């Protein structure tokens, strides 16, 4: 019995360990978010199918790692779901052919927020999976340890909803101009959702965000966000109503706003956070 990864890294007869680099493309699902489907990444075969039947399980102790180490979820093994990190060994899958067959493992996260996410950098460890191989012929009992690494920078959604982008940069035109902010949200199932803004503000009404430009900043001006013409103060929840699988726009527009005193020419920049909440 031996295994290999999609890029050709092999663990030979007798077991061992290998690193698996996967391109993460997480998907928000109802009740669980797909992190990675490893059936497209790890393949195994039986070297002596005429005389031996190999049995393969996912062993107790498999878990998320790195920035995901504090999260839990489920693992789908051969079509059935089990808690992850694994607290017991899964039922076995039979390997009885020399032809490489996918190892049927997919990892999911349990949502813990509305539309949160965890940023993962390329090269980061995300999980350690322990494949156990036995057979019906002798006392062979080998471990194949797979260290799963991200091959790309990605944000893994940790909520039941997700946004079109985690970072949105818009460029305001000249003073008194405005620009729409292209930000949408969708959910795996319909649920009432709202959001609020956060950031450093320059006025008593908490509605004008401070100009934080470090190079040649303009004076007397900040940035204000509106929705359908209505000013949105920081920390005031805006209701979006029921949000389902079709993306819903937040309807935000960025505008200049006077903070007092004389307006002088220069650069204007503000960083404004958007936090989603279930309602």
Where are the predicted features?
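Mature extracellular/passenger domains of Gram-negative fimbrial/pilin and adhesin proteins
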Residues: 1-279
């Amino acid at each position: 019995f031996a295994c290999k990864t999609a890029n050709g890294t092999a663990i030979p007869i007798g077991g061992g360990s290998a690193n698996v680099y996967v391109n993460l493309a997480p998907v928000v699902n109802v009740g669980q978010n797909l992190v990675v489907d490893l059936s497209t990444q790890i393949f195994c075969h039986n070297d002596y199918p005429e005389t031996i039947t190999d049995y393969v399980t996912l062993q107790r102790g498999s878990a998320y790692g790195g920035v995901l180490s504090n999260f839990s979820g489920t693992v789908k093994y051969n079509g059935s779901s089990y808690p992850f990190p694994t607290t017991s060994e899964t039922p076995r899958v039979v390997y009885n052919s020399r032809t490489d067959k996918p190892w049927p493992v997919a990892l999911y996260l349990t949502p813990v927020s509305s539309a949160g996410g965890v940023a993962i950098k390329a090269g980061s460890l995300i999980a350690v999976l322990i494949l156990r191989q036995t057979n019906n012929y002798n006392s062979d009992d080998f471990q194949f340890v797979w260290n799963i690494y991200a091959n790309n920078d990605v944000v893994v959604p940790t909520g039941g909803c997700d946004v079109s982008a985690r970072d949105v940069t818009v460029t305001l035109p000249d003073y008194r101009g405005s620009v729409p902010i292209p930000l949408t949200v969708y959910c795996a199932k319909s649920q009432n959702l709202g959001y609020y803004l956060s950031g450093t503000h320059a006025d008593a009404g908490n509605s004008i965000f401070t100009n934080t430009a470090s190079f040649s900043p303009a004076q007397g001006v900040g940035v204000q966000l509106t929705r359908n013409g209505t000013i949105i103060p920081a920390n005031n929840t805006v209701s979006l109503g029921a949000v389902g699988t079709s993306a819903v726009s937040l309807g935000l527009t960025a505008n200049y706003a006077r903070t007092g005193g004389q307006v002088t020419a220069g650069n204007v920049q503000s960083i404004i956070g958007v936090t989603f909440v279930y309602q």
